[in-house]
């Protein structure tokens, strides 16, 4: 997922180019504006964390581009491509990562990436109801 700062910062096409050049296939994509209820449901696992209200506010501050990516080892390769959560640290330790390119800090870090195959499956189904579970496991998709 390209977060609001990535979309509003006009990084969408650059990120998509990086994704394709890294060997991913963009299977599906959808530009959407999350409302509070949707953002809260998507990030439900973080609901007890102190940053949750700020995360929901941020994720509803502008449109996001949700994508389903396909590649062998998609989750781990995507995590490598986006870099560390904190964009400031990414600029030092992973200067060629997506978060180093367009992120600002640990929240406004431009992109979201599933942290596991099971998270990817849940997140893909959250936005793309027509993608069935077997397709995800077989084709090794990753929600972005």
Swiss-Prot record:
GO molecular function, one term: nucleoside diphosphate kinase activity
EC number: 2.7.4.6
Pfam families: NDK (PF00334)
Classification via InterPro entries: NDK-like_dom, NDK-like_dom_sf, Nucleoside_diP_kinase
SMART domains xref list: NDK
Gene Ontology annotations of biological process type: CTP biosynthetic process; GTP biosynthetic process; UTP biosynthetic process
Keyword check for Repeat: no
Enzymatic reactions: a 2'-deoxyribonucleoside 5'-diphosphate + ATP = a 2'-deoxyribonucleoside 5'-triphosphate + ADP; a ribonucleoside 5'-diphosphate + ATP = a ribonucleoside 5'-triphosphate + ADP
The keyword RNA-binding is assigned to this record: no
Annotated residues for binding of ATP: 3, 51, 79, 85, 99, 109
Catalytic residues, chain numbering: 112
Family, similarity comment: Belongs to the NDK family.
Function: Involved in the synthesis of nucleoside triphosphates other than ATP. The ATP gamma phosphate is transferred to the NDP beta phosphate via a ping-pong mechanism, using a phosphorylated active-site intermediate.
Name this protein carries in UniProt: Probable nucleoside diphosphate kinase 5
Species assigned in the record: Arabidopsis thaliana
